[in-house]
């Protein structure tokens, strides 16, 4: 009996050790599989977010902090559904949409998506131009050209060295963004009590209600919704139903949670910096004015880090936006063109705006209007497709997820209508 118990104990110990080693190996592999969501998350820390969050913090202090948190949670759900669609169906969102349409409708859908891609480029290129102007005192036009060129080089990294290296470069830029926008906390720390109060949903007059609607409505970016499905598919392929797919979906959920948490921290930091240092400053109507205010209140070093964060945001988001544009064209039209030509198509409007001396702040505002028009065309089909059992099989959305998805899709679409109205009337 003693010998048998000993053998049994040794057997259990061996199996336990093997299980532990297997779990550890799986965890290591899971960390290796992370990345697509970090690329998509760049859309949530672009120059448009900088302007919106800084403006909110400067006007209302900590009041809108809960809005930023809610917006990132809603965006996280949408991004997961997009990645899930790619893994389960083996199609990007543009490809899946195109198969539901006749040719004329598909062409029209592509035209609006292409306008969204161009509007995205305007925001990123203008933001990069402003950052280069702040850091190196070059003209806005030259700054825009440099931003476009660097973004093209980043895309060449993807084409020649693969998606994994591209993801690592973009993730590196994301952490530069984190440092750039959180460094001010080493000089001025936010009040924990005020932060807790800022997490309590409430408003302060009609203007705060409208601004909250604008923040949520401007958070979900259509190009990121299209892109994430393609990123997940390119990175993980189309796994067969079963253990492999379930594991990749778990990894994808972790990927989205981590990436959107980082994006949420950055957006929160933008608002808190403004709430602590820029309240009552009449400088937040344009990004360069925000830099000046930070320099006056926190010093040249923190202001420089802010500008570097803005530059990293612009470079990363410009390359990710161009990647999304190529994915959209390939998915909807079933054709692709060389990346250089593709990049020039979407880059030209942004460079033309800078060359003509158009006010960069107004260009950012107008680009957000165009982006707002594109939101329903990306989010509503996504929820419908991921709830299609014929397409998704056993991985179709849970009924609760479907209800929440439709609620988010309709809410974000309506809030973008509000955003358009507010922008036009102001």
UniProtKB/Swiss-Prot annotation:
Has UniProt tagged this entry with the keyword Transmembrane?
Answer: yes
Ranges annotated as spanning the membrane: 31-51, 58-78, 134-156, 169-189, 208-228, 256-276, 298-318, 337-357, 363-383, 402-422
Tagged with keyword NADP: no
- Grouped into one coarse class, the protein's main location is membrane
InterPro entries (alphabetical): NRAMP_fam
Provide the topology term for how it sits in the membrane: Multi-pass membrane protein
User: What's an example of a GO molecular-function annotation for this chain?
Assistant: manganese ion transmembrane transporter activity
One GO term describing the cellular component: plasma membrane
What biological-process terms (Gene Ontology) are attached? iron ion transmembrane transport
The cross-references to Pfam families, in alphabetical order and at most eight, read: Nramp
Similarity comment text for this entry? Belongs to the NRAMP family.
Function noted in UniProt: H(+)-stimulated, divalent metal cation uptake system.
| Protein name as annotated | Divalent metal cation transporter MntH
Source species of the chain = Mycobacterium leprae (strain TN)
User: Coding gene?
Assistant: mntH
């Amino acid at each position: 009996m003693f010998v048998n118990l000993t053998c049994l104990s040794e057997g259990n110990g061996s199996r336990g050790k093997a299980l532990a080693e297997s779990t550890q190996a799986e965890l290591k592999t899971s960390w290796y599989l992370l990345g697509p969501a970090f690329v998509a998350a760049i859309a949530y820390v672009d120059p448009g977010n900088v302007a919106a969050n800084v403006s909110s913090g400067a006007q209302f202090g900590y009041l809108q902090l809960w809005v930023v948190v809610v917006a990132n949670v809603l965006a996280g759900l949408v991004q997961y559904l997009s990645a899930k669609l790619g893994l389960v169906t083996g199609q990007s969102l543009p490809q899946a949409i195109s198969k539901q349409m006749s040719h004329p409708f598909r062409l029209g859908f592509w035209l609006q998506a292409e306008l969204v891609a161009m509007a995205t480029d305007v925001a990123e290129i203008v933001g990069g131009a402003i950052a280069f102007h702040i850091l190196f005192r070059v003209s806005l036009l030259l700054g825009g050209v440099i931003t476009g060129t660097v973004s093209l080089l980043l895309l060449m990294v993807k084409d020649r060295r693969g998606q994994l290296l591209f993801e690592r470069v973009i993730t590196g830029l994301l952490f530069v963004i984190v440092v750039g926008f959180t460094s001010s906390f080493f000089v001025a720390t936010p009040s924990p009590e005020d932060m807790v109060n800022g997490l309590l949903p409430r408003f302060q007059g009609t203007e705060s209600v409208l601004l909250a609607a604008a923040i949520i409505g401007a958070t979900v970016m259509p190009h990121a919704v299209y892109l994430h499905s393609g990123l997940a598919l390119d990175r993980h392929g189309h796994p067969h139903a079963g253990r492999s797919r379930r594991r990749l979906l778990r990894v994808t959920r972790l990927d989205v949670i981590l990436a959107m948490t980082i994006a949420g921290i950055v957006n929160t930091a933008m608002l808190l910096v403004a709430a602590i240092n820029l309240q009552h400053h009449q400088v937040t109507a344009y990004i360069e004015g925000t830099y000046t205010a930070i320099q006056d209140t926190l010093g040249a070093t923190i202001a420089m880090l802010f500008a570097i964060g803005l530059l990293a945001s612009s470079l990363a988001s410009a390359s990710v936006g161009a990647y999304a544009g190529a994915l959209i064209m390939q998915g909807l039209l079933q054709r692709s063109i060389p990346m250089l030509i593709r990049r020039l198509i979407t880059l030209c409007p942004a460079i033309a705006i800078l060359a003509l001396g158009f006010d960069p702040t107004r260009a950012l505002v107008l680009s957000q209007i165009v982006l707002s028009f594109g939101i329903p065309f990306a989010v509503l089909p996504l929820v419908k497709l991921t709830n299609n059992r014929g397409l998704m099989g056993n991985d179709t959305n849970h009924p609760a997820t479907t209800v929440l998805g439709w609620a988010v899709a309709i809410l974000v679409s309506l809030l973008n209508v509000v955003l358009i109205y507010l922008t036009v009337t102001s």
